[in-house]
Amino acid sequence: PTDPFSRPSQYKRMGWGFKMGYGSGKNYIDLYLLRACDSENSIDEIWRQQIPPQENIVVGLKGRVTPFKWLAFTANMATSVFNTDLRAPEIPITTKFDKIFDVKYSSLMRFAGDLNANLNLKGVNASISYRMVQPDYTSLGTYYMSNNYHSLGLTLGTTLFNKISLSGTFSGQADNLSKEQLYTTCGYVYAANASMRLGSHFTVTAGYNGYLQSQRAGTRAVNDTTKIHRMMSSYSLTPSYSYETDLLGHSVSLTANMTQNEDLNKFATGESDVKTKALGLSYNVDVKPIETDFTLTYSHQESKGFKSKYISDVASLGTSRSFLKEKNLNLSASVSLCYNEIVRQSKRLSLGGDFSTSYN
């Protein structure tokens, strides 16, 4: 805190914006406008030499069209005109933006948007979406935003016999829209989930999640020995049982999970591969006469990598209760015992506690 150069200074930034729209909940269009600008003299001169003042205008459109009860389209689009350095010289030509924005040699105009189609037919829900963000798309209205990529996503869900719920998702993404990177990175995320209710007390949920990352040539051919080609797969199974009496409400759940993270490069040595197995057990009881919940949990995790193995066991006991007439004062407390071991390296046993209160 005593070092004046430990953290860069920041310009005083002024901004304004508005939103206007027309339509109903099913069919509408909204217009957004944001303008933000840094005040060049708001920081010390020593910092001005290192940090350029910036300016930004963003125009956005958001809309929805519902041609049928079972089909709806939504879209979001934005154009950002960004001056990366207000001190840069102006372009000596007349443009239609002169009255609202000084076009400089540091100015960038970039586009971002997405389009979604949603389908809902007799127990089947489906959607498809596409998103594109141009390289160097930047806005002073957001702290951080990924750019230089496009993606396509699909989702599908249905219910069978009013007892079984099925859902699946898939999305693919690739960067290097500018075609200027050395390599193009592609990522694919996919998942499938199923949930079945047996009677009025028992439920079973199973799921699979996967991620595949690969690399293609950009301005340079990919080297087979260093090519990125990784896959992560995760499987889970969760049976749960619950029932109530006049005095108590009981719920028990068991969770089993296995995750495999591996390098698919044929030249890989397996040093970065990790396989994790986890098992969890939870029991909750609601004591109705005193309106208090008690929870007992236990979890075991075992991760095995290249010449390494990690083991963790955690047991905890917690309680919570709401007070006052509106039940808006909440108190909770818990105590936990944790055992961690890195095989042939270290072992640790720790005890912890937690107490929290909230009012809403």
Annotated model-derived regions:
Residues K19-G25, N118-K122:
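Eukaryotic alpha-helical scaffold "rod" segments
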Residues P1-G21, D30-P52, V133, Y137-N147:
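Surface-exposed coil loops of outer-membrane beta-barrel proteins
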Residues P52, N56-N360:
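Exposed, low-structure sequence patches enriched in small/polar residues
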